[in-house]
Regions:
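Long, low-complexity C-terminal extensions of enzymes
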Residues: 239-315
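A solvent-exposed, charged loop/short amphipathic helix patch at secondary-structure junctions
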Residues: 1, 11-44, 154, 160, ...
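GT-A fold catalytic core of metal-dependent nucleotide-sugar glycosyltransferases
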Residues: 77-78, 115-160
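Hydrophobic targeting segments
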Residues: 3-6, 59, 68-71
């Protein structure tokens, strides 16, 4: 059985927004958060595109092999009204169900992703998605799992490498998080992995991830305790997939063929993606016209997936 885990935030939930702003102001005053950290506070991080229903339609149309979809939200009020909560293939999971209590509430995708292995009922084989990762054409199971292992790109590298194998030349918080992760991997394995963050669906083994989480739980929770928001002290969930490769627990291949990553903008011709299997439609601070781009994207997705899925209420 193969499950999919997807995270979702409803920015229009006033209670959630008030809570977000409370912790943001508190941590800025305490010096724990940088108000200029766009990785935590940029409007593009949680801007509402209203395309989640099309994500579910893509799953139903193109990933018939999926056992269940685990929708991760902070609490019950974050669940979309149109969602068919009684559908047997849908499992709604709240942060309190799998994240350590001392870290709650959290608004940090890094923290949330690190604790996915704690989710009860989750199958051993699962795929992690964001809500902007779309399956546009039929996908076979062996794209993600082959020979009993998750499929990942081969990005193992030699010990002596340029700049020690770390990302340089930027103060971007996310790059610092990636470097933290690379350094931690080297510390515990004496091996290095190339920068390998792919903003597309990623295959996991719950059994393996849980073994790593349990073994290094003190180090991981320490990294996540500093702030409620993404910050330079975090590790990222790519820790699990990098270690899969280091410990030879992955099948090496290319799950991302005929797929791409797109930074959204108003001048994009979405028909370009008609022959793509998977696409990440990524929001950025450089987006020039949100409303126009949103309309064009929704029109494209509605044309691609015009029929409701069983994940949606009938009425």
């Amino acid at each position: 059985m193969i499950d999919i885990v997807i995270t979702y935030v409803n920015e229009n939930d006033i209670e959630w927004k008030d809570n977000f702003n409370y912790w943001k102001d508190k941590e800025i005053k305490e010096g724990k958060a940088d108000p200029n950290n766009r990785q935590a506070f940029g409007k593009e991080r949680i801007r509402q595109w209203d395309f989640l229903k099309y994500w579910f339609r893509g799953i139903e149309n193109n990933c018939s092999w999926v056992n269940k979809v685990f929708l991760i939200v902070q609490n019950e009020k974050q669940v979309p009204e149109w969602l068919n909560k009684d559908y047997e293939k849908l499992k709604i999971v709240y942060h309190e169900d799998f994240i350590p209590k001392e870290l709650l509430p959290t608004f940090n995708a890094m923290t949330i992703g690190m604790y996915f292995p704690n989710i009860k009922e989750l199958s051993n084989y699962f795929i992690v998605c964001d809500d902007d990762y779309f399956f546009l054409r039929p996908i076979a199971i062996d794209r993600f799992f082959k020979y009993g292992k998750p499929v990942h790109l081969d990005n193992k590298m030699e010990y002596k490498i340029y700049n020690g194998g770390y990302l340089t030349g930027t103060d971007n918080v996310f790059y610092k998080v990636l470097n933290n992760t690379l350094k931690f991997e080297y510390k515990i394995t004496n091996q290095k992995i190339k920068y390998g963050f792919y903003h597309l669906p990623v295959a996991h083994s719950k059994e393996f991830d849980l073994s790593i989480l349990n073994k290094y739980k003190n180090e991981i929770i320490k990294c996540d305790s500093y702030s409620k928001f993404r910050n330079e002290h975090n590790l990222c969930p790519e820790l699990y997939t990098d270690l899969l490769k280091i410990y030879n627990k992955a099948t090496l291949g290319n799950p991302y063929r005929h797929s791409c990553y797109c930074n959204l903008n108003s001048d994009i011709d979405f028909n370009y993606f008609n022959d793509k299997d998977m696409v990440c439609f990524n929001d950025t601070e450089r987006l020039d016209n949100f409303e126009l781009t949103k309309k064009k994207l929704i029109d494209y997705l509605d044309n691609k997936f015009p029929n409701k899925s069983k994940f949606e209420k009938e009425e």
